[in-house]
Amino acid sequence: VAEMSDAAGTLWLDVGRRDWSDKLLAATGLTRAQMPALVEGSDVSGTLRADLAQRWGIPRVPVAGGGGDNAATACGMGVMTPGTGFLSLGTSGVLFAATESYAPNTGDAVHTFCHAIPATWHQMGVILSASDSMSWLSEITGRAVPDLAGLVPDDVGAPSPVGFLPPWFLALSPRN
């Protein structure tokens, strides 16, 4: 079983239709028969196995579809309706916004995926080395991270044409 928000990252899902793409599967020599069943994040995808329920001393509870990491984070933060979003900065950096329809934005290389909430999508930009990049700069300059962050003025406007794309870590945005 695969859940929609996680399946969207496989590139085999027709994200707008929330179904496997026969065209993309065929392009990679696969068929629907080789793919898992698709469920929404809130759908029951199975039941806890009897042996595990017995071992853990709990009933055979339903198991929900769940969600991909960022979609599940969004649900936990209440980012489930259009116009809501979050910014997460850690080892990776994510800018996530819930949307009411499939609205790809390939011109800006922003991902458009299914949300873990039925009939909802999300757009996100991701870089897998957000705070790691600051740590790297701190190490090579010998300056503490707070000191480097203090160099950025409070009234920063539009992004500068100068860019930084760390080559040692994967970047999902702006290259998709």
Question: Over which residues does each language-model region extend?
Answer:
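Conserved N-terminal phosphate-binding loop of PLP-dependent enzymes in the Aspartate aminotransferase
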Residues: 30
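Active-site core segments that coordinate phosphate-bearing ligands/cofactors
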Residues: 1-2, 6-27, 50-176
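Short active-site oxyanion
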Residues: 33-38, 59-63
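Glycine-rich phosphate-binding loops at beta-strand->alpha-helix junctions
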Residues: 40-48, 67
